[in-house]
Amino acid sequence: MILFAGDPHGSYDHIYPFIKEQENVALIILGDLQLTTSDELDKLAKHCDIWFIHGNHDSKTISAFDSIWGSEWQSRNLHNRVVDIQGTRIAGLGGVFRGQIWMPPNRPMFFDPIHYCQYSPQEKIWRGGVPLRHRTSIFPSDIEILENQQADVLICHEAPKPHPMGFQVINDLAMKMGVKLVFHGHHHENFTYRTKYPYKITNVGFRSLADAEGNYLLQTIDDREK
């Protein structure tokens, strides 16, 4: 059984009732894990097979970044690859578009992280690469890596069209990869799009859960203080 989890933002208690009552669950988190240590993933892993993509909040602090990329859990990040999970080919596009790198449909400022570093002053370089913030920025190279591969499902943090804040480049990627389902997080609502595209799009909202067909198992409203 595959479950898709919307942005947890550091809280995972809502997931346990669903992974404890089922056997052989693969849990796929759609970004914004917002961890301070990797302990929470270690606890979840006792009950399910964990996969994820990163979101914009996963490079907001060094601790959030290191909880993923400084731990063994970085191997479970689906970003920029296709992995067979329980017989389903799942492609991952983590992160968000940012104007300093690329804000489609505008032309990109940089093609990939190496290009960014070549034209950046030394004080902007962090740990030998792009700044912490841009470790979760989408570069054109990320799309290029995926677009010549095939998958059944595309997961992303950013939304495709027709979301008002969605990006056509994600729709184009889904078409090239031949997927039948797209799941995304980032925007905290829960809804399934009705579109002309030959694939189903599901927005899995804040601390919510959906099954592999895009049916909601848990819908949560983000009532945190702004």
UniProtKB/Swiss-Prot annotation:
Write down what this protein is called: Uncharacterized protein HI_0762
Please name the InterPro entries in this protein's record: Calcineurin-like_PHP_ApaH, Metallo-depent_PP-like, P-Estase_HI0762_prd
**What SUPFAM superfamilies does this protein's entry cite?**
Metallo-dependent phosphatases (SSF56300)
Q: Show which residues constitute the signal peptide.
A: none
Gene Ontology molecular-function annotations: hydrolase activity
User: Which Pfam families does UniProt cross-reference here?
Assistant: Metallophos (PF00149)
